[in-house]
Amino acid sequence: MSSSLFEEAINLQRAAHELMYLGMDGSPIYSDDLSRRNGEVYRLTAALYGSSARGTTTEEQANVCLALLMGYNASFIDHGEKQDHLQKILNRCWNLLDTLPASLLKLRLLTACYGEVFDEPLADEARKIISSWDSASLTAEQQEAVEEFRN
């Protein structure tokens, strides 16, 4: 993945995550901050979706799809294109999930896809990945992904 595409995907994932969990730490949520963050996530999502770059490897493509799913999920802006874009992203995900090895990235992508379609086989596959990990030695990222899946 080109560094700029990778950076775009990671920046969108980070911004979407922050928007989704805004106020969960007990801090107050201010409408101007919520509006600004929502607009930024939507702008980043639209820019990445509109980009012709999709990544060259399965992992790169999965990272872009994950970022897009997170962005559309976090933002409540919709100019009528959201459902069509989500369906196109999900269609790309179905092919990627078949070839992506069991990993943190695959768990995160399965979780994001499941959040859109609630298809139980996706959850079953995510549970298999989680059960293959040694729960005593999970990284912070793995722990966070497991929590996101369980929520």
Model regions: which residues?
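Amphipathic alpha-helical repeat scaffolds of TPR domains
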Residues: S2-Y30, R54-I77, P101-E116, E144-E148
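Amphipathic alpha-helices that form helix-helix packing interfaces
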Residues: A9-L12, A16, V41-L44, A126
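Low-complexity, intrinsically disordered regions enriched in charged/polar residues
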Residues: S3-F6, Y42, E120, D124, ...
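Flexible helix-coil transition and linker loops at the boundaries of alpha-helical arrays
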Residues: A46-Q61, C93-K106, S132-A136, A140
